[in-house]
């Protein structure tokens, strides 16, 4: 078993990775770090671009290469992940199908790269959360970055009361805590109810933030603290 796992949670062009964020609600792991990775997509297959009519990849990758796909009139087939789509192409062994994935994935499966850099925007980054079974304060990553500025991630849902969401959001203003992200996702267990995902600057170990989180807990029907971790800047 590994000490850490890495989960893609959002992309700078296509937004949040829904499956990953849904998983964070139930997974019993602490967020102990974040990584920003520059995404460079390649068209991979055994045929030439002129022969290809269908392309496989994860929905996020297909969305990030929308312009290239439209310009070449390609049909799209969603797959579970980008690396998995390379295996599909290898197994199909047809010159009219290709996939979108990384150059590294092409090398692993021994499939040629037809064209590199097919993403719509060069400013294409995916943010990953680093997850660990260890608590935040015990993780090696947190110890190595003990002096860094911190960020905390939480998930909560609100009660069905007028102004319930406002009562939570106003606490961040009251305590002068800077929000870096807020968004909602449907609750998979109850129709038309939502979970809210919030990132904010500061540590859950700070006494003021502890006090704020207690107030948020009192105004929410569900609260999960994913963890506190060092803030990472994009180079």
Q: Model features per residue range: what roles?
A:
Residues 1-235:
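Domain-level signature for soluble enzymes in the chorismate/prephenate branch of the shikimate pathway
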